[in-house]
């Protein structure tokens, strides 16, 4: 797993190469409002044209971090000649298109980007493979035994506690009830819920609630 510092160091040292674009690091950790800061300023150059971007860096490529990055960049009071850019380890083609629709540029460590200087140039690159797969404790929570946690939200879209979810899952698991198989543990349920929050499937506030099926 990479860190934000390591990512910004690569940007600072000119190691982010996304032809036909070239990048020049200008500054980092600057205030842009009363309580807002940006991680870096960079120049993106294409042929003889260049544009300046305010970069928000996220070290995890989860839907939650992606959406948080978009929301933060949209909230910044940037000058008219500085444009927002999200920097993540990996950006999928779908995410690049979403950024483009929001008027936000994006670059990653896998060779993908959408960089837009309105009215001057637009560069879209996709297809670079994800070199930073999920480090979640359970690699795919939507398969095999752990998928029962997600299916539990189709029965009840809102739970008070993790214990309630675990009880619902184990009550509906015929292998537990008929064959005395080991019930799902509380720690497994918690790990699955953590990933579901990062994937923006559920939210955990006062209750644990389904956001989208």
Go through the PLM ranges and name each one:
Residues 1-31:
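Acidic-basic catalytic patches of nuclease active cores, encompassing PD-(D/E)XK
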Residues 146-213:
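Loop-centered beta-sheet repeat module
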Residues 123-151:
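Short alpha-helical segments that sit at the start of domains
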Residues 116-121:
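Short, charged, surface-exposed secondary-structure boundary motifs
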Residues 103-115:
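Charged, structured surface patches that assemble and position nucleic-acid processing machinery
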Residues 77-103:
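Nucleic-acid nuclease catalytic cores
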Residues 36-77, 85-86:
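Conserved catalytic cores of phosphodiester-cleaving nucleases, focusing on short active-site segments
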């Amino acid at each position: 797993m990479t860190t934000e510092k390591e990512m910004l160091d690569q940007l600072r040292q000119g190691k982010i190469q996304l032809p036909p674009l070239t990048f020049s690091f200008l500054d980092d950790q600057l205030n842009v409002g009363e309580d807002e800061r940006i991680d870096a300023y960079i120049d993106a150059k294409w042929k003889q044209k260049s544009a300046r971007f305010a970069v928000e860096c996220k070290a995890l490529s989860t839907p939650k971090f992606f959406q948080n990055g978009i929301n933060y960049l949209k909230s910044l009071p940037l000058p008219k000649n500085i444009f927002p850019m999200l920097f993540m380890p990996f950006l999928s083609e779908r995410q690049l298109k979403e950024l483009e629709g929001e008027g936000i540029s994006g670059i990653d460590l896998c060779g993908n980007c959408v960089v837009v200087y309105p009215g001057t140039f637009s560069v879209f690159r996709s297809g670079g493979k994800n070199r930073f797969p999920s480090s979640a404790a359970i690699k795919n929570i939507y398969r095999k035994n752990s998928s029962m946690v997600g299916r539990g939200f189709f029965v009840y879209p809102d739970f008070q506690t993790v214990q309630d979810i675990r009880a619902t899952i184990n009550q509906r698991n015929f292998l537990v009830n008929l064959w005395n198989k080991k019930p799902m543990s509380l720690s497994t349920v918690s790990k699955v819920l953590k990933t579901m929050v990062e994937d923006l499937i559920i939210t955990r506030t006062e209750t644990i609630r389904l956001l989208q099926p």
